[in-house]
């Protein structure tokens, strides 16, 4: 069992409060480990069945997402938009492996939403990992807005700067140059600019 899934299992198991929940979770894990078409169908039903606990939906979505089953997409995006950063990180890892073309658009929408800026870190990191056409515009837009805002949210701004550096796209140089004027971002922005300047131009 991969480390990410083991961490998810440990986290969920620690949150269970009754023998019935423990038994239900063991049954769910048995489906995950079965790795058969019939088991995948059962996991997909968990995603849409009424009154399923959040931990069941999360586990089923992660298991399906990491094997490329696109039925997990909506649940994983919901988890990516969740207030719990650990749950967001788990969803991002599954989405990175899902291979659904909708993922980058959804992550960009979350990353650029000014109302959700506190929770933008994992959508930003996911966009960097995906290296999708939406990645650079979304990170640049978010960084531009944060630099102009009264509250800069330095951790999110730094993630944008570092992400743009990792993507190495010359289109990001103007906003990175603005970011370099802020002491909290100077070192990361200068490094990102250097990478963007040496990137091959299409």
Predicted features by range, described:
Residues 11-15, 42-50, 75-83, 106-114, ...:
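Alpha-solenoid HEAT/Armadillo-like helical repeat scaffolds in large eukaryotic proteins
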Residues 1-2, 14, 18-36, 45, ...:
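Structural detector for internal amphipathic alpha-helices that build alpha-solenoid repeat scaffolds
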Residues 103:
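Residue-level hotspots at or immediately adjacent to binding/recognition sites across diverse folds
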């Amino acid at each position: 069992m991969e480390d990410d899934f083991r961490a998810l299992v440990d986290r969920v198991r620690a949150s269970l409060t009754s023998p019935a929940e423990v038994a239900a979770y063991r049954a769910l894990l048995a489906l995950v480990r079965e790795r058969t078409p019939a088991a995948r169908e059962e996991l997909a039903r968990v995603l849409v069945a009424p009154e399923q606990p959040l931990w069941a939906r999360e586990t089923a979505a992660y298991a399906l997402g990491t094997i490329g089953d696109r039925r997990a997409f909506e649940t994983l995006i919901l988890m990516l938009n969740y207030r719990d950063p650990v749950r967001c990180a788990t969803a991002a890892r599954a989405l990175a492996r899902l291979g659904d073309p909708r993922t980058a658009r959804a992550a960009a929408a979350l990353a650029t939403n000014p109302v959700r800026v506190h929770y933008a870190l994992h959508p930003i990191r996911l966009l960097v990992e995906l290296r999708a056409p939406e990645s650079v515009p979304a990170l640049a837009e978010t960084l531009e807005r944060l630099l102009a805002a009264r509250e800069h949210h330095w951790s999110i701004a730094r993630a944008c700067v570092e992400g743009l550096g990792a993507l190495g796209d010359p289109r990001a140089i103007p906003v990175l140059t603005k970011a370099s004027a802020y002491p909290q971002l100077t070192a990361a922005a200068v490094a990102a600019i250097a990478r963007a300047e040496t990137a091959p131009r299409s």
